[in-house]
Amino acid sequence: MQTYIATFFSHFGAIRFNKQLKELGLSGKLMPVPRRVSSSCGTCVKFEAESDTAVHSDDLEQLFLVNGEELTMLHSNI
């Protein structure tokens, strides 16, 4: 399993994404966006999945792979 952080254009998008994760049997955690990441919305979802293609959302702003303290951007809709 890989750990990811997803940012969103709106708080509602983050909540909806977290609900989608639960429906897929994945656990997500709503949390403040890390300071080193710029985002339209101040809320992100941290989650674990086998791959970044396991989930999709039209509200997704950016997707990062988490490796310890390092974040690698995988996708951006900015």
Q: What do these predicted ranges mean?
A:
Residues E48-I78:
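C-terminal structural segments of small proteins and small subunits
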Residues M1-Q2, L60:
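A structure-centric signal for secondary-structure junctions around beta-strands
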Residues Q2-H11, F17, K22-E50:
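Amphipathic, hydrophobic secondary-structure cores in small proteins
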